[in-house]
A protein has these predicted regions:
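Glycine-rich phosphate-binding loops that contact phosphosugars or nucleotide phosphates
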Residues: 44-170
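Glycine-rich phosphate/diphosphate-binding loops that line cofactor/substrate pockets in enzymes
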Residues: 35-47
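N-terminal amphipathic/basic leader segments beginning at the initiator methionine
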Residues: 2-34, 38
């Protein structure tokens, strides 16, 4: 027989998730506001490929945007959901690190590799080590609000990724 405490816990979790999902339209409005004030420098470098690295909820936005824009973009977009980085990444690559917490080990490792290869890097996070990495290395980054499960913050990820593509004229 299922324990009553477990049922109450699941019911409470459902209520919390329902509330977070219902907040999606407001998150979209806030994400658009953040995007309108974010500045991504063009820096004159030609971008020949894009790599988006992110795990779990932070990586889902990259999948959606890559599929959505695949017929619109003239350059390839590759998604990474682990520690790796494609061998082709170089000075002409844009590597976008998406980590809601800013502390996702796999994303940070991929960005370290991209940094060592001279790639252009942009971060999307709510703070953490990713913000520090970007600030320390003078990389552009966009801060989004923290405090919720990454899978419920999809609006921020999608809007900021599209914002980056638009600002860079991709």
């Amino acid at each position: 027989m299922v324990n009553r405490t477990i049922l109450i816990t699941f019911t409470n979790l459902k209520l919390v998730m329902d509330k977070l999902i219902a907040a999606f339209p407001n998150n979209m409005i806030e994400a658009l506001s953040i995007a309108s004030s974010a500045h991504i420098s063009k820096n004159g470098r030609e971008i020949r490929n894009v790599v988006i690295t992110g795990m779990g909820g932070s990586g889902i936005g990259g999948k959606i945007v890559a599929l959505w824009l695949q017929d619109e973009l003239s350059i390839p977009v590759v998604l990474i959901n682990d520690y790796t980085l494609p061998e082709f990444v170089n000075h002409d690559s844009l590597v976008i690190g998406s980590s809601y917490s800013g502390n996702t080990e796999e994303t940070l490792m991929s960005l370290q590799k991209a940094h060592s290869k001279g790639a252009r890097i942009i971060g999307i996070c709510s703070g953490g080590d990713l913000e520090v990495f970007c600030r320390t290395n003078s990389y552009d980054y966009i801060l989004v609000p923290g405090g919720n499960p990454p899978r419920t913050q999809l609006a921020y990820s999608i809007v900021q990724l599209v914002n980056i593509f638009v600002q860079l004229g991709l």
